């Protein structure tokens, strides 16, 4: 998958820990991959929320991160062939690329060039859940 990111001109922040961080760092060090990748420790909820809301795009294997990306209208590439949050693909900003480096490279090009798919916010993702819950409870 790192091969699929090798031509990126955007800085890449990888929130990894332990063995995953070491494996990725070793792979990056053993290739001609530009030094645009920065590996950081996993962040607090608020810090991670800030990073994801202000990112040019997100690459993840997490359905929950894809949800955050859709809510913030940030392009998201999921390194999987399925998601438990299909609305992020059908309505939102998420695209599934599986484990194919070429598909990742094409999606990254769209992300960086600003040609990402048009997306919306899925039904009931309007931030008004508390109001709806109170309305149901008061009946």
Question: What role is predicted for each listed range?
Answer:
Residues 1-139:
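Nucleotide-activated sugar donor-binding and catalytic core shared by glycosyltransferases
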């Amino acid at each position: 998958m790192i091969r699929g990111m090798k031509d990126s001109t955007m800085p890449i922040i990888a929130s990894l820990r332990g063995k995953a961080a070491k494996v990725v760092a070793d792979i990056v060090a053993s290739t001609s991959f530009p030094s645009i990748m920065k590996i950081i420790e996993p962040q607090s909820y608020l810090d991670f929320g800030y990073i994801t809301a202000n990112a040019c795009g997100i690459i993840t294997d997490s359905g929950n991160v894809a949800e955050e990306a859709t809510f913030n209208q940030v392009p998201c590439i999921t390194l999987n062939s399925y998601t438990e949050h299909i609305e992020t693909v059908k309505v939102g900003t998420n695209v599934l690329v599986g484990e194919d480096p070429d598909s990742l490279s094409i999606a990254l090009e769209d992300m960086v060039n600003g040609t990402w798919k048009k997306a919306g916010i899925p039904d009931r993702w309007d931030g008004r859940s508390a109001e709806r819950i109170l309305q149901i409870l008061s009946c």
